[in-house]
Regions:
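Non-catalytic, solvent-exposed segments at the cell envelope interface
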Residues: 1-216
Length: 216
């Protein structure tokens, strides 16, 4: 969200996006996360978007479920029957299609599911839908009394390099523009076998448009 802009833009980077690692070898974007310091992921974002990353925040599954439950659930439209069992990780996704309010565990299944033709690209769209619904729920005045509960979740499960002032500044800017001025999009690109290959020209145009506050 550039200074002076009335729009907050969230860009999703698909997990299978090709990016050069520290050794110059092209790898999946998600390989920069597991077992590596945040700097590796921040550098990966810079490589695929051209944007420097000043701060980072890591929200784990427990934090995600806690936030959703603290908000009383999240309203989404489940677009298809979703059923998946992972014996190794010991979790089950079991959702039926239609408009509904999901609790934390169900919402986590919704944003993790990718057993369909478009795989992670379809999952990204569901994650964006859920984020927008969460943003709308979060600004409900009734939740002002749950600030302490939210902060307990942050203290217990969220890892970041931000201070309290920066949290407050981001929150105030988000409240100022409101969720109706949030927009979500996926890193422009195309499938290249099992990978997502960023379209450098389209990415460049998108980033410049965001910086200038223009139409996308």
């Amino acid at each position: 969200m550039p200074r002076g802009s009335q729009t907050a833009t969230i860009i999703s980077i698909p997990r299978d996006t090709l990016v050069a690692n520290g050794g110059g070898r092209e790898v999946r974007f998600n390989s920069l996360y597991k077992g590596l310091p945040p700097d590796a992921l921040m550098e990966g974002v810079r490589k695929v978007t051209g944007l420097g990353v000043d701060r980072w925040i890591k929200v784990d599954f427990d934090a995600f479920m806690g936030f959703v439950d603290a908000l009383g659930g999240v309203a989404v439209t489940v677009d298809k029957r979703m059923y998946y069992e992972d014996d190794a990780a010991k979790y089950i996704i079991d959702l039926k299609p239609g408009e509904q309010v999901l609790d934390g565990k169900q919402a986590l299944g919704f944003v993790r599911y990718r057993q369909d033709a478009l795989g992670d690209i379809a999952r990204v769209a569901r994650q964006q839908q859920l984020f927008m619904s969460l943003a709308k729920a979060a600004i409900n005045p009734a939740h002002i009394f749950k600030v302490g509960e939210f902060m307990d979740i942050v203290d217990k499960y969220v890892v970041n390099d931000m201070n309290l002032y920066e949290y407050a500044a981001i929150g105030m800017r988000a409240l100022k523009v409101g969720p109706s001025s949030f927009e979500t999009m996926t890193l422009p690109g195309r499938f290249s076998g099992p990978y997502w290959e960023a379209d450098e020209a389209e990415v460049g145009r998108l980033i410049e448009s965001i910086k200038g506050g223009g139409d996308r």
